[in-house]
Amino acid sequence: MFHLSRWLRLSEAFTRLNRPVVVVDLESTGGNLYQDRVTEIAFLRFENGRVEHYEQLINPGKPIPEFVVQLTGITNEMVAQAPAFDQIAPDLSLIHI
């Protein structure tokens, strides 16, 4: 999960760049592109001193391995009622990153 306070400390430096900066974080059930699925997507968008934040748990449609639970803190119970990725994908296209 995002550590928002850490990124907010950098917002002043990002502002000096005079362009938008987006930090994206994806969590998944593992590292295999063909077998594993996204469990969370989050981003921070810094522009003109403003910070936009988006964070969404995603139901991967498969169990999260215990080692991934230990690594990310995201449990099967947390994603059980979350939307599937294809349900949120259209919303992501509306985000101007």
Can you say where each PLM-predicted feature lies in the sequence?
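Conserved non-catalytic scaffold segment of RNase H-like nuclease domains
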Residues: 2-95
